[in-house]
Regions:
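Glycine/proline-rich low-complexity spacer/linker segments in large multi-domain proteins
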Residues: 108-123, 176-229, 233, 254, ...
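Beta-strand-rich binding/interaction modules
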Residues: 246, 259, 562-565, 571-637
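Early extracytoplasmic/domain-onset interaction patches
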Residues: 23-99
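Solvent-exposed beta-hairpin/edge-strand motifs
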Residues: 93-140, 242-243, 599, 604-609
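Short, hydrophobic/aromatic-enriched beta-strand segments in well-ordered soluble domains
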Residues: 81-83, 87, 98-102, 167-181, ...
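Hydrophobic alpha-helical and helix-loop surface patches within well-folded domains
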Residues: 2, 15, 27-41, 45-47, ...
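A surface-exposed beta-strand-loop module
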Residues: 23-28, 76, 86, 92, ...
Length: 655
């Protein structure tokens, strides 16, 4: 053999080896995708393997009585609060942990340090809560309590333990704080043409949750959201006599604070499917200054984890009846300044609230409270039981999307009481998911499909937008503590990815009939309770009838990518009449059920469904196709329902 021939052979071998080395190996590993899944929280007698509260499930309770006053000159809220805490746990409790969320506004707060001023504007710094007195009731008498404040938390040492299994203690707190003037901690006040609007939330010291998984859950308030106990509230707000107060729950003294005309119009609204004006723009302009006179507005709310309210002399007010299942009703209301009036603006707010509450109640779980109130004010885009805060300049679809989303939070987390601080997707993602269908349904799709900052903000199909997120190596998984998710990923991951995952689960994995039954059962089982992610996963598997370990692992616990390809189409014996074999490959770790579309040269089409079991043993599948006309092309996921990262290999054209 000549040296020249040897050189040629060696060069050919080198080229072949290089080509082999450059061919990317398929990263798909079915043993990894379909491995047994250990969920974050184990099944116990308290939380069952079926995703329901178990026979031993317990939950503590906090009932509140609060008398508050607002000094509108100094912008200070002062209050006297009594908390009755019931310990249903199996543990005697020697101390209580209280949440002091107003301390977020202190310049030395952990939340301000973490946000670097991004969330909390330095101009809104305050002293936080000023605690004038903290006492514990013992033998019917108040006893000064020893307490320690740490950032947004306070530990109160008790003179005697609260006994397990139903023991009670009463805590009295007298306090005041300066109301922050800029949004950042999810509340604010601001001046407008007809008077200041105060959106008051996190306005009273609140019990932390003591649960079966962590005992006291004492994550500090870093400007994300909340985890709260359920109970009943009686609260009163004293304000200048020219102000209107709208709050969570039922107004118990309308005869003391409303005019006869306002009471009559409210009665009319309770019987009307059309919006009724309770206070007109002209009446706002004609309201005289109150002088030194004040009014006290009293509210009551049951089965709630929180209350919030708004107050202003400049509110236009309207309302309409909400028709609930079983012949029940509630009242949709909106309060907004005259500058927000308009048929393309806040004059339609009550219609949006009414429609959303009616549809969510019919589809998922009946709305439980007497009122659903939308507020135009400075604390834009925030939700509380029975009341939500939105932007005074919102209009048209922007106002619709934000109104439907915020009132949708009545179900998640106000009814289904998840831990927003640890598992934000369980309220934001699930709520965004139910918003998708409200956007499709309202006024025959007037504003649908849902496309906003929370869900599919770009021009591409939602699946194609999600595919880009899955390729981002820095994107966190959905199951991340809320405080660790950077702002860049908050909406894309916590809202959009979680919601889109649930649409996949409903429309492509379980189907609407199985999904809806399982989802309704989850809501009913966990209403006014505290589910964790594992409870949701188990509930959907048990009632939905599928082992979804592969889906939870790939979509929620990881940020796995998805890539299907049509690699080859070959006729049997070269004859279309004898059939064809289509080779499909799964080229990445995330598996999803898919549709394979056969397009014939006659113009006919045929769809073949590939379940996830297709990929249980291998990343390559040869799909047999019955004999028929000549095939023009074969496409996997032709309708862009799946987040396929590379669509260039989704279609195979048959020459």
């Amino acid at each position: 053999m000549s040296w020249r021939l040897i050189a040629v052979l060696l060069a050919a071998m080198a080229i072949a080896n290089a080509a082999h080395a450059e061919a990317p190996a398929n990263p798909y590993d079915p043993l990894k995708t379909f491995a047994p899944l250990t969920l974050p929280q184990p099944a116990t007698p308290l939380r069952t393997g079926a995703g329901t509260p178990g026979p031993a499930y317990w939950q503590n309770r906090a009932d509140y009585s609060i008398e508050a006053r607002i000094d509108t000159a100094a912008h200070v809220l002062s209050a006297d609060e009594t908390i009755t805490y019931t310990n249903n746990s199996p543990d005697n409790l020697d101390f209580l942990w209280i949440q002091l969320d107003q301390n977020l506004y202190r310049p030395d707060s952990r939340g301000y340090a973490m946000g670097g001023g991004r969330r909390i504007d330095p101009r809104s710094h305050t002293e936080g809560y000023v605690l004038d007195a903290v006492t514990v009731e013992r033998a019917g008498k108040p006893v000064a309590a020893h307490y320690v404040v740490s950032d947004t938390r306070m530990r109160v040492d008790l003179p005697a333990a609260v006994k397990a299994g139903g023991g009670q203690v009463k805590l009295h707190v007298r306090y005041h704080f300066t109301i922050p003037g800029l949004f950042g901690g999810r509340m604010a006040w601001a001046d407008y043409k007809n008077g200041a609007i105060y959106d008051l939330a996190q306005w009273y010291p609140r019990l932390a949750v003591y649960d079966d998984l962590r005992g006291w859950d004492t994550l500090p308030y870093l400007a994300n959201e909340f985890y709260l106990e359920y109970g009943s509230f009686d609260y009163a707000v004293t304000v200048p006599a020219d102000m209107i107060v709208a709050g969570s729950g039922r107004l118990t003294n309308p005869q003391e604070v409303l005019t006869p005309a306002q009471r009559a119009r409210l009665a009319e609204a309770r019987a009307s499917d059309k919006t009724v004006l309770i206070r007109t723009p002209e009446e706002v302009a004609a309201t005289p200054p109150p002088g030194a006179a004040t009014k006290t507005w009293r509210f009551h709310m049951d089965s709630t984890r929180d209350v919030a309210f708004t107050a202003s002399r400049g509110f236009v007010w309207d309302a309409a009846r909400i028709n609930l299942p079983d012949g029940k009703s509630a009242l949709a209301q909106s309060v907004y300044p005259p500058e927000s009036v308009g048929e393309n603006a806040w004059s339609r707010s009550t219609k949006y609230i009414k429609d959303a509450v009616e549809r969510f109640s019919k589809r998922w779980f009946p709305y439980p409270w007497p009122n659903a109130i939308n507020v135009a004010g400075p604390a834009t885009g925030m939700e509380y039981p029975g009341i939500v805060f939105d932007g005074i300049t919102d209009k048209a679809k922007t106002l619709f999307f934000i109104s439907a989303h915020e009132i949708g939070h009545s179900w998640f987390p106000m009814i289904v009481g998840s831990d927003e601080r640890r598992d934000a997707w369980m309220d934001e993602g699930i709520n965004t998911f139910i918003d998708v269908y409200e956007s499709d349904d309202f006024a025959n799709g007037l504003y649908g499909p849902k496309r906003d900052s929370e869900y599919a903000p770009g021009p591409e199909a939602p699946a194609d937008q999600i595919a880009k997120l899955l390729e981002d190596p820095e994107a966190p998984p959905i199951l991340s503590r809320a405080d660790t998710v950077r702002e860049k990923y908050r909406h894309p991951v916590t809202y959009f990815k979680a919601a889109f995952g649930l649409t996949l689960l409903r429309e492509d994995i379980l189907g609407p009939e199985r999904f809806d039954a399982a989802f309704r059962k989850y809501i009913a089982d966990w209403a006014y309770r505290h589910p964790k992610p594992s409870d949701f996963f188990r509930a959907m598997e048990s009632a939905g009838g599928e082992d979804l370990s592969w889906f939870w692992r790939g979509w929620f616990l990881n940020n796995w990518k998805h890539d299907l390809a049509v690699a080859k189409v070959a006729y049997v014996d070269g004859d279309p009449a004898k059939g064809a074999e289509v080779t499909v490959e799964n080229r990445d770790q995330l598996v999803l059920p898919a549709t394979l579309r056969i397009s014939y040269k006659t113009g006919a089409k045929k769809d073949v469904r590939l379940p996830v079991e297709t990929w249980m043993q291998s990343g390559t599948k040869v799909v047999p196709i019955e004999g028929g006309p000549a095939i023009a092309e074969v496409t996997i996921d032709p309708d862009h329902r799946l987040p396929d990262k590379d669509r260039s290999n989704n279609t195979f054209v048959v020459r």
